């Protein structure tokens, strides 16, 4: 009987409309995206980048830990030994279509060479443009170095 009375007096509709009316006069929470951008968390996992030392030398020591830990098998590394005996990468590819942005590659890297940066606007029309090679990753690192360094500094206590 009570359910009949509730449906007769349109109780559900009145309840829903009161909820709508409650939020109607509150300030809007949406933003006009291309023109306004919201705050990005320091722990945000975006576009990958390879970092360099202050001297300009790349940080990656070709230990291949990131390749081994990647659950999606999105990273391919080939390395050669230099004249001074140190190993460096000759090929460092990341297939961004396979990547699940878990951050395990960043956690596994002993020298903070591979990081996931603050950029989330890297859409592409072709599959080939989403396969990042070493040069593109180094360019990303050079472009985002200040943001990457501050991001790693903020997260240092929790690592």
Swiss-Prot record:
Which of the seven top EC classes does this enzyme belong to? translocase
The processes (GO biological process) annotated in the record are: aerobic respiration
Q: Which GO terms describe its cellular component?
A: plasma membrane
Q: What is its EC number?
A: 7.1.1.-
The 4Fe-4S ferredoxin-type domain sits at: 51-80, 90-119
Requisite cofactors: [4Fe-4S] cluster
What reaction(s) does this enzyme catalyze?
a quinone + NADH + 5 H(+)(in) = a quinol + NAD(+) + 4 H(+)(out)
Against SUPFAM superfamilies, the record matches this protein to: 4Fe-4S ferredoxins
Asked whether the UniProt record includes Lipid biosynthesis among its keywords, one would answer no
Q: Which InterPro entries match?
A: 4Fe4S_Fe-S-bd, 4Fe4S_Fe_S_CS, NADH_quinone_OxRdtase_chainI
**Alphabetized UniProt keyword annotations:** 4Fe-4S, Cell inner membrane, Cell membrane, Iron, Iron-sulfur, Membrane, Metal-binding, NAD, Quinone, Repeat, Translocase, Ubiquinone
Identify the residues that bind [4Fe-4S] cluster 1: 60, 63, 66, 109
What's one GO MF term for it? quinone binding
The record describes the protein's role as: NDH-1 shuttles electrons from NADH, via FMN and iron-sulfur (Fe-S) centers, to quinones in the respiratory chain. The immediate electron acceptor for the enzyme in this species is believed to be ubiquinone. Couples the redox reaction to proton translocation (for every two electrons transferred, four hydrogen ions are translocated across the cytoplasmic membrane), and thus conserves the redox energy in a proton gradient.
Q: How does it assemble?
A: NDH-1 is composed of 14 different subunits. Subunits NuoA, H, J, K, L, M, N constitute the membrane sector of the complex.
Q: Which family does it belong to?
A: Belongs to the complex I 23 kDa subunit family.
Q: What is this protein called?
A: NADH-quinone oxidoreductase subunit I
Give the organism, scientific name: Rickettsia akari (strain Hartford)
């Amino acid at each position: 009987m009570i359910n009949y009375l509730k449906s007769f007096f349109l109780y559900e509709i009145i309840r829903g409309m009161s909820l709508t009316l409650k939020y109607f006069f509150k300030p809007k929470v949406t933003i006009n995206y291309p023109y306004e951008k919201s705050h990005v968390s320091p722990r945000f996992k975006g576009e990958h980048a390879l970092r360099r030392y202050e001297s300009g030398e790349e940080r990656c020591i070709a230990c291949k830990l990131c390749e081994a830990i990647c659950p999606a098998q999105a990273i391919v590394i080939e390395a050669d030994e230099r004249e001074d005996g140190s190993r460096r990468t000759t090929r460092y590819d990341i297939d961004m279509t396979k990547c699940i942005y878990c951050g395990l590659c960043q956690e596994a890297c002993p020298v903070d060479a591979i990081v996931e940066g603050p950029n989330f606007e890297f859409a592409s029309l072709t599959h080939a443009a989403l396969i990042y090679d070493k040069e593109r990753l180094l360019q990303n690192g050079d472009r985002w170095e200040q943001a990457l360094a501050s991001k790693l500094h903020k997260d240092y206590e929790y690592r």
